[in-house]
């Protein structure tokens, strides 16, 4: 059996970083995202990859063509695949629950990579141009600290921290 490096996606959004790593042969252990709509997109993409890997893309086509509902579509997918998408806002208050859920998904296996890009509105050039003083009080400025907590806890071989200026 070929080893597939395993990764965790934080601040996952609709899964752009995940998509690249999945296509490169990595296994997604979990995605943490606060936006419900983005979580549905992540679940759909994870379902697509599972169906592709199991030669069942006809089911994906049925869903895209609205021949089956989202719930019917999800019935084809193992719970562990859909359950890898965790709908949380990453904060000091939610970290214990997130760690508990991620720990369960990681299990005894290694976590090779953590990827993620916290929201950058608070300190991007565009965000700062709206209000220099508001930047200091914006809690999004400090989300990198939570990312660092995941690095300390899981000690991956690699990490990708994406952001913009």
Per-range role (PLM):
Residues 1-165:
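Conserved active-site and SAM-binding loop architecture
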